[in-house]
């Protein structure tokens, strides 16, 4: 299931439906091939939308203290709960893409934290000079 989250479920549902309908082997092969072509197209669209969302999520800056705290918690949960769950369900490309984007942004802001000796860069999710009130 390396192509995406729903590919395996869709193909298995089609296989089960074809076996229940008792169609010929030739028709069955043709339907399965058509479904695989459709899932590849669906996965390309899903990858694009997912990667745009993850980049937006990685770069988003909340305005309130509660929002900033929630974003940090969500990013940690995504990295330590959701990404391993994706790897476990064999969605390797999704998991790797999410982990690389979020860790890349974290390390980019962490570099500025180390350089200027303040945690505000990670808290505010910015890389420009940042001063807390």
Curated annotation (Swiss-Prot):
InterPro entries from the UniProt entry: a/bCoV_VIROPORIN_3A-like_TM (IPR046445), Coronavirus_Orf3a/b (IPR004293)
PROSITE patterns documented for this protein: COV_VIROPORIN_3A_TM
Domain of life: Viruses
Signal peptide location: 1-21
Sequence ranges assigned to domain CoV 3a-like viroporin TM in this UniProt record: 34-124
Primary location: host cell
Membrane spanning residue stretches: 40-60, 69-89, 91-111
Gene Ontology terms: cellular component: host cell membrane; membrane
Family membership: Belongs to the coronaviruses NS4a protein family.
Protein name: Non-structural protein 4a
Lineage: Viruses, Riboviria, Orthornavirae, Pisuviricota, Pisoniviricetes
